[in-house]
């Protein structure tokens, strides 16, 4: 019985190995082509997020994390969140260069440029008063932009509580 079992496994392994051996194409075999993808996969690959998507997914969480880091006086995390916010804003302008015939990067700079520079200075100096004012100005810039673009119903504010239960904002 044991011999039959061993022979059965050996035969299965041999068949499996033979099945995995690649065939050598002949000179007359046409090359394999991959058909164009259709359906959900190709749609996902061609998806370009809109300005609203990018603001919601990239900018808003980083704005909140920056505020939460400041509330805990975690200057290292505030510096990191600030850089992430800078990159997120730049990404929005790169992914969506135009919105309703407006240059997105220029809009962002005009509404947030000065407060972002002030935030950078405040973080470097660990100046809580300067940070608080610059963060308020940044938040106001966001809301001014929303209003100017007829989206005044989107109101950004300083976070009251964290939406990130798995992240500690207190300095280690």
What are these regions (language model features)?
Residues 4-16:
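Bacterial N-terminal signal peptides
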Residues 23-172:
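Sequence context surrounding c-type heme c attachment/ligation sites in exported
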């Amino acid at each position: 019985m044991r011999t039959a079992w061993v022979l059965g496994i050996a035969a299965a392994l041999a068949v499996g190995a033979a099945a995995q051996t690649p065939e050598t194409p002949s000179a007359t075999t046409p090359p394999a082509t991959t058909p164009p993808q259709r359906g959900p996969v190709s749609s996902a690959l061609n998806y370009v997020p809109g300005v609203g998507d990018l603001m919601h997914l990239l900018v808003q969480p980083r704005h909140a994390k920056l505020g939460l880091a400041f509330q805990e006086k975690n200057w290292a995390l505030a510096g990191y969140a600030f850089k992430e916010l800078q990159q997120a804003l730049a990404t929005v302008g790169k992914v969506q260069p135009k919105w309703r015939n407006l240059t997105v990067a220029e809009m962002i700079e005009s509404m947030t440029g000065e407060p972002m520079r002030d935030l950078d200075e405040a973080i470097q100096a660990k100046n809580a008063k300067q940070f608080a004012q610059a963060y308020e100005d940044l938040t106001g810039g966001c809301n001014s932009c929303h209003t100017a673009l007829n989206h005044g119903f989107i109101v950004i504010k300083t976070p009251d509580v964290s939406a990130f239960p798995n992240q500690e904002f207190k300095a280690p």
